[in-house]
Amino acid sequence: MRKQTPSQTVGPFYAIGLTRKPMNLMAMESTQGERIRVEGRVFDGDGAAIPDVMVEIWQANAYGRYNHPDDKQEKPLDPMFTGWGRSGTDEQCFYSFETIKPGPVPGNDATVQAPHVDVCIMARGMLVHAFTRIYFSDEQANESDPVLLSVKNKKRRRTLVATRGEKDGKVVYRFDIRLQGDNETVFFDM
């Protein structure tokens, strides 16, 4: 493994990927599926919210199909849904995405993965990106998801589950990310 130096922390460095155009609005009026908002904050090891974090997500559409050439499923594609978004944290250190609840996707060995969102976190001072997942608290399929069940400690497993709520008549899932310390979010090697 190559060694990192302090000046080689993870980006974001390239302005082309950091336009002022909102990249967190993933669900349009005609996007198929249940419209949801995913929001939260990112905390450091001392429990302080971090102000300058970039959160990227990618997910399947409501049918459980990714908008990617390698997804060869017979499920429909939704032309109004790319399945990808990016959000920087705001003045109150919140990130948010307006999206849809994804459908279940195939796993390895003929298993089915519960609806989930894949997440990549980039922040000042991090030497590598951190990857995690968001599962949904109201999904029965979580009980048999092979990735979620690979986290043997149930307390740690809960760090991957967003809590369903409602705000202004809309469905909101709250998912806080803890980079270190008590209740550190489970991260995956990618």
Regions found by a protein language model. Name each.
Residues 1-190:
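Beta-strand-dominated extracellular/periplasmic modules and repeats
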